[in-house]
Swiss-Prot record:
PANTHER family: TRANSCRIPTION ACTIVATOR OF GLUCONEOGENESIS ERT1, ZN(II)2CYS6 TRANSCRIPTION FACTOR (EUROFUNG)-RELATED. The lineage of its organism: Eukaryota, Fungi, Dikarya, Ascomycota, Pezizomycotina. Transcription factor which regulates nonfermentable carbon utilization. Activator of gluconeogenetic genes. Residues 1-33, 267-284, 397-411, 562-574 have a biased composition (Polar residues). Belongs to the ERT1/acuK family. Signal peptide: none annotated. The keyword Metal-binding applies. Disulfide bonds: none annotated. Residues 1-62, 174-223, 264-308, 380-420, 537-574, 639-668 are annotated as: Disordered. This is Transcription activator of gluconeogenesis MCYG_04674.
Length: 739
């Protein structure tokens, strides 16, 4: 092949390749244009399918149907829903079942339906049980013979969402729904006459009978006459509460109903102002053998109606046997081994706390009632026939509750001034804190060892310059005003001390006791007159290793300094000054040192600060009380009874369960077994110390000087408040009980 032929062939190949390349580029360009058109078309289609922005947001359904719930699809509130209609499942469209909480596992699914579904289920279930049980009177009689005249509902057959749309439309919330019974609440059967031993003696016989229809079927009110879980009883419209759960809506409605009666409404106002209960704000509900009406003649039985809001009366004493019915022996036997509760009464007589042996729930097993004769009569009464029981119940008195009047709630009004203006008229001279600190110094030097005295002196010396700096510019009028502020604060604390129910003490900044509560005297044996300096202090318990000292009193040879008003240029005559007990005399050595070290930090430190720690209070013991002292462990004998409540301690016998008694008639209580004032006196009887935890803070006056020290604490099984120159701390501190 010649060179010319080769060159021509290459030229032809290049031309063909160029044409192919041009064709390829054109093809690529066409494909890209088609792709762009396709994407644009898809975007337009997507934009066309987009939701209209003006379209309102679809409301979320309260509960999806079963099919939509399994498919995780959007459902509606209507039944059948639109999706089930499109798919042809409209006949099987019903609410789905949600996962129940653990406390609802025993409740059927029908009772958890939203709105009125649960009431409709209860009504349908009650009607079905009435029809099925028309020929079974034996089962009904078995339920009636219960001593409490109610039984838990028998296990019914739940057909599970078998109601149709017609049933939902035909059923309304009317009076017939008041008889609906929740499956988790007790059933009160009223289909047959009730035995009179389960009803109130004043209830007519017709109240225990239920009218029935002509065909023998029970009436629409044959179910519950008092069902706490029935929303119709409290006029609750659960459908309007927008709750998805029957029990949640009922709980919310019950809280609202309870809140309607907490206002300060006078007792004479109508009960309807507190929220009506039942169909006509009244009903019938009787306790076993009791009638809580005003009288059996002028009023009938009621259920929390208008008559239930009337004032309580004192017409007759409470009959314990009649109140607790035939189970009185069983109740008393079960409660005989429990520790007796106690309450300290410092209010009017109608608030007096009954003695431990007077409580019907705290009687011993050997004597269930007041005496053996009553117990024998009660046992013989159980064997009498029904007519005799009816006659006896008619003759028994009406059970009444104590009368509670608003005007009788004036605690401590006999000793309290009518107003605070008398304080400003009575205070004429300032209080000598200098004499108080001198007396405190003499007491500390006499009681404590040199090492402990040095620690206390260092703590007080650290705040002495601050006291001097804050008081050097005060004149006589300022000091008088300071004392008026102190007395005014005590006047304010009077109600707190009487109402708190815990041992309370109020002291000045020198540690001198200014006020004390009755509970503190009962617990420690320190009488109020002794603590305030109105009576001599004969205490010999200083917290030593032997518990009690047989030597001199805690005062020793110390003579209180007389208070002279010459230092204030008011008079030249010296007036004897009463010396109250110091706080240091009520604590053991370690507690006193710890207190003053903390007081030095808090006196001029944080005005809102507080200290929480433990301490040991010393019991009040005289030489007569310490007549018998154990040689080895320092236990106190039976003669250690306090002046407060000592007589009651000897009245305790040793026949109760779980307790032992000493040879001199005293009782040793176990941990947590405290009964009345006598039981409180037993605290710390071994070593003369009561261990407790306490919290205290400092209250300052208008000159920013510590005025009061407030201590709140708690003894074994008993709260204690020790207020020493400060604002009371209302927080309750649990006891740190140690063996």
């Amino acid at each position: 092949m010649s060179p010319h032929q080769t060159t021509g062939q290459e030229s032809d190949n290049m031309a063909v390749n160029g044409e192919n390349a041009q064709a390829s580029s054109q093809y690529i360009q066409l494909n890209s244009e088609e792709t762009t058109d396709t994407v644009a078309a898809e975007k337009k289609a997507a934009a066309a399918k987009a939701k209209d922005p003006s379209r309102p947001k679809r409301k979320k359904a309260k509960r999806a149907c079963y099919a939509c719930q399994r498919g995780h699809l959007t459902c509606g509130d209507e039944r059948p829903c639109q999706r089930c209609i499109k798919r042809g499942f409209q006949d099987a469209c019903h609410d789905g079942v949600r996962k129940k909480a653990k406390y609802l596992h025993d409740a059927p699914n029908e009772a958890l339906m939203a709105g009125v579904g649960a009431s409709l289920y209860n009504q349908r279930n009650t009607t079905q049980n009435s029809i099925n049980g028309a020929n079974a009177p034996s089962s009904a009689s078995q339920q009636i013979t219960s001593p409490n005249f109610y039984n838990a509902q028998q296990s019914p057959d739940y057909n599970g969402y078998s109601q149709t749309k017609a049933e939902l439309q035909d059923s309304t919330i009317g009076p017939e729904n008041f008889a609906s019974q929740s499956p988790v609440s007790p059933t009160y059967q009223m289909g047959q006459p009730m035995p009179n031993q389960g009803l109130s003696p004043s209830l007519p016989q017709s109240a225990s009978e239920t009218p029935s229809t002509a065909n023998g079927a029970p009436s629409q009110f044959n179910s519950a006459f008092f069902d706490p879980s029935d929303p119709a009883l409290f006029n609750f419209d659960l459908a309007s509460m927008n709750f998805g759960n029957h029990y949640g809506a009922l709980e919310f409605g019950m809280l609202g109903h309870m809140a309607t009666g907490v206002g300060d409404t006078p007792p004479s106002d109508n009960g309807a102002q507190r929220g009506s209960i039942g169909q006509n704000s009244s009903g019938t509900f009787g306790l076993a053998g009791s009638n809580f009406a005003e009288s059996p003649s002028n009023q009938g039985p009621y259920l929390f109606g208008d008559s239930g809001m009337n004032d309580w009366t004192q017409s007759a004493p409470v009959n314990r046997r009649n109140m607790y019915g035939s189970n009185a022996n069983m109740v008393a036997g079960n409660m005989s081994d429990k520790p007796h509760a106690f309450a300290i009464e410092s209010a009017p007589a109608n608030f007096a706390s009954p003695a431990s042996n007077e409580s019907p729930m705290m009687t011993t097993s050997s004597a269930t009632f007041e005496d053996a004769a009553n117990a024998t009569a009660f046992n013989s009464r159980q064997n009498t026939s029904l007519p005799q029981q009816q006659q006896q119940q008619r003759q028994q008195p009406v059970v009444s509750t104590p009368q509670l009047k608003q005007q009788n709630l004036n605690i401590g009004s006999r000793r309290r001034h009518k107003n605070a203006s008398s304080i400003y008229d009575s205070v004429k001279d300032p209080y000598s804190y200098t004499s108080g600190f001198h007396s405190l110094t003499a007491f500390i030097q006499r009681r404590f060892s040199p090492q402990k005295t040095l620690r206390i002196a260092k703590a007080l010396a650290s705040i002495r310059p601050s006291f001097i700096a804050t008081t050097k510019t005060l004149n006589r009028d300022d000091l008088i005003f300071m004392e008026k502020c102190f007395q005014r604060t005590l006047w304010e604390y009077e109600d707190f001390i009487n109402a708190c129910g815990t041992p309370t003490i109020v002291c000045r900044r020198t540690g001198e006791i200014a006020a004390v509560g009755k509970e503190f005297s009962i617990l420690t044996g320190w009488r109020k007159e002794v603590l305030l300096g109105k009576e001599p202090n004969h205490n010999v318990n200083t917290g030593g290793s032997s518990g009690l000292l047989t030597g001199s009193t805690s005062r020793g040879s110390y003579t209180p300094r007389p208070y002279s008003s010459d230092q204030f240029n008011s008079s030249t005559t010296a007036t004897p000054r009463t010396q109250p007990v110091f706080l240091a005399e009520l604590l053991d050595d370690d507690s006193v040192i710890e207190f003053y070290e903390d007081f030095a930090k808090l006196a001029f430190g944080d005005s809102r600060g507080s200290v929480m720690t433990t301490c040991k209070l010393l019991k009040y013991k005289t030489k007569a009380d310490s007549g018998v002292i154990a040689s080895g462990n320092g236990e106190v004998g039976a003669a250690q009874n306090n002046e407060v409540g000592s007589g009651e301690a000897n009245e305790l016998n040793s026949s109760s369960n779980g307790t032992t008694s000493t040879g001199r008639g005293q009782r040793r209580w176990g941990k947590g077994e405290i009964a009345g004032e006598a039981g409180m006196n037993q605290l710390g009887f071994r070593d003369g110390k009561v261990e407790c935890s306490y919290c205290w803070t400092v209250k300052r006056d208008v000159f920013d000087i510590p005025m009061l020290i407030v201590m709140n604490g708690e003894m074994e099984c008993m709260e204690v408040n020790i207020i020493t120159s400060g604002q009371p701390n209302y927080q309750a501190f649990r006891a740190l009980v140690k063996d």
